[in-house]
Every structure is written in structure tokens, then in C-alpha cells.
Amino acid sequence: MDALKSAGRALIRSPSLAKQSWGGGGRHRKLPENWTDTRETLLEGMLFSLKYLGMTLVEQPKGEELSAAAIKRIVATAKASGKKLQKVTLKVSPRGIILTDNLTNQLIENVSIYRISYCTADKMHDKVFAYIAQSQHNQSLECHAFLCTKRKMAQAVTLTVAQAFKVAFEFWQVSKEEKEKRDKASQEGGDVLGARQDCTPSLKSLVATGNLLDLEETAKAPLSTVSANTTNMDEVPRPQALSGSSVVWELDDGLDEAFSRLAQSRTNPQVLDTGLTAQDMHYAQCLSPVDWDKPDSSGTEQDDLFSF
């Protein structure tokens, strides 16, 4: 909860930071001085300009060897096609990953954070970022890969997704607790109403009045719920503000089930598995976003497929 409050306060202090985009070859205006400042903008979303390599199906929700093999297939397919890679913007937040086309600004993909089971900066193709997520249409697992300008960018995106997942998990925990409290209160309220009906011969109008009073009390409650009748199973609800300066998200049953199932596959249910080593994580955390756009010391960068 302390992490949520801290992130919320940081976002209020600097909401404009979330509008910036990294990896776009100088499109940004001013970047945070360190990774901590960047991390604080997650609630609204961080933008990364990448190139989409493609997607392939995988059999398991996580694994370094599994993702490496999937990325190898994706890269081989992209090379064989001979087509220019699609330039995209990746927006990462605790809600998930939103993928849009840079030229048309058209939405390509909107993946709930609760469906993502793994992300990595590939070791063989060191400028590739990839994530594995459960399809919103069925239970198949998809590996999506993206070409970054350099390895440090791929590491930064991976770290951002992992951090977004951590915040989202805390939202989920709070949401579950609040839902249990509401269900318990609702059950107790129903028991009281039933007892009144048993002992008092009331008219239907009196029962209706009692229901209206219950609705008024519900409307005054600090938590507002999201309808579970949504037609989009991957539509991630907006966080609802609570009187205690906390944030709660309501999940539909489909997302809740998917998140719970994927949690069983993780090494630690509270942490998104990544392909980053402890050294990689430390290096990425020490980076300034300004460094992400600097050319590598090896010379002029080429961002086409054949520079691997």
C-alpha cells in the first residue's frame, strides 16, 4: 500500500512526465534524470517507440529457453518476409500494454497486465524485447517481439513492464479485499432485511423503499463498482479512488480467473518473471532515460533486422 500511495503522490506532482515517449529518436522534450523518476509515471503510462517484429504461439507461460526459441522463430519469419518493420508505440501502465501504429495512430493491441505472464530482453538478439500473454479470445499463449534501438532500451521496457505488474498486483490484492468486505456487508444486510420481513407484515412498497435506502447508502460509499456485463473481456477498468487515498480496481470474472491461473505458473505470484539477471536489473535501474537514446559505443546504430 505504501508503494501505491507513493506512486500516486508522485504522479500528482509530475503528471506531464507520462506523456513523454522514449526511443523515438529525439521526439521527447525533457526526460527524467533517473529511473526512479520515470518509474513514478507508471500510473498514467510510459511510452516507448519500437518496431514490431511479430507474434508466435508458445506452449508455456514463461521460460528463458522458451522465449528465446519463440523470438528466434519470429525474427526468422520477419527476415524472410523482407518487409519493413511496423513502427509502433508501446504504452505501459498497470492497466497493461497498449500497442498503436505510429503512422496511423490506430490501435493494434490492448493487452491487460493481468494476462501477461513473462517478459524479457533477449540475450541472443540483444535489441529485442518480448512478452508472453494469454490471448483474450481463448487460452492460447502468444509471444510478441519488438525491435528496440539498443539493448539498454530492451532492458528498460522489460523493467517497466515488471514494475507495472508489481503495482497492478497490489491493486488486485486491494480489490479482492474490498470485494470480500462488500460481499460480507451485502450478505449481512440481506439477513437483516429478511428478518424484518419475517417479523413485520410489510407491503411491497415498504420493501421497495427499503431497497432504495440501501441503494442510497451504496451510492454514498467511497468505492464505485464496475459493471461485470462488459462485452470486452480485456477491458481493464479504471482505478477507483477511496477515502483512504488508496486505489482499487474491479476485475471482471474472466480477467480475475486468467490472472489467478497465470499466478500459479510464476516463481513468485507477486512478481512478473523476466529474463533479466540481477546484474541486468541493477544496470537498467541505474540508467537514465536520456541514455536510452544515446548511440552505442560500438558505432553507428542500425535498427534494421539484418543488424543482428
Curated annotation (Swiss-Prot):
Record GO biological process: amyloid precursor protein metabolic process; cellular response to cytokine stimulus; cholesterol homeostasis; cholesterol metabolic process; cholesterol transport; low-density lipoprotein particle clearance; positive regulation of cholesterol metabolic process; positive regulation of low-density lipoprotein particle clearance
Modified residues (N-acetylmethionine): M1
Annotated keywords: Acetylation, Atherosclerosis, Cholesterol metabolism, Cytoplasm, Disease variant, Endocytosis, Hyperlipidemia, Lipid metabolism, Phosphoprotein, Steroid metabolism, Sterol metabolism
Compartments where located: Cytoplasm
Phenotype for E216A: Abolishes clathrin binding
Tissue expr: Expressed at high levels in the kidney, liver, and placenta, with lower levels detectable in brain, heart, muscle, colon, spleen, intestine, lung, and leukocytes.
Disease tied to this protein: Hypercholesterolemia, familial, 4: A form of hypercholesterolemia, a disorder of lipoprotein metabolism characterized by elevated serum low-density lipoprotein (LDL) cholesterol levels, which result in excess deposition of cholesterol in tissues and leads to xanthelasma, xanthomas, accelerated atherosclerosis and increased risk of premature coronary heart disease. FHCL4 inheritance is autosomal recessive.
Domain notes from UniProt: The [DE]-X(1,2)-F-X-X-[FL]-X-X-X-R motif mediates interaction the AP-2 complex subunit AP2B1. The PID domain mediates interaction with the NPXY internalization motif of LDLR.
Role this protein plays: Adapter protein (clathrin-associated sorting protein (CLASP)) required for efficient endocytosis of the LDL receptor (LDLR) in polarized cells such as hepatocytes and lymphocytes, but not in non-polarized cells (fibroblasts). May be required for LDL binding and internalization but not for receptor clustering in coated pits. May facilitate the endocytosis of LDLR and LDLR-LDL complexes from coated pits by stabilizing the interaction between the receptor and the structural components of the pits. May also be involved in the internalization of other LDLR family members.
Protein name as catalogued: Low density lipoprotein receptor adapter protein 1
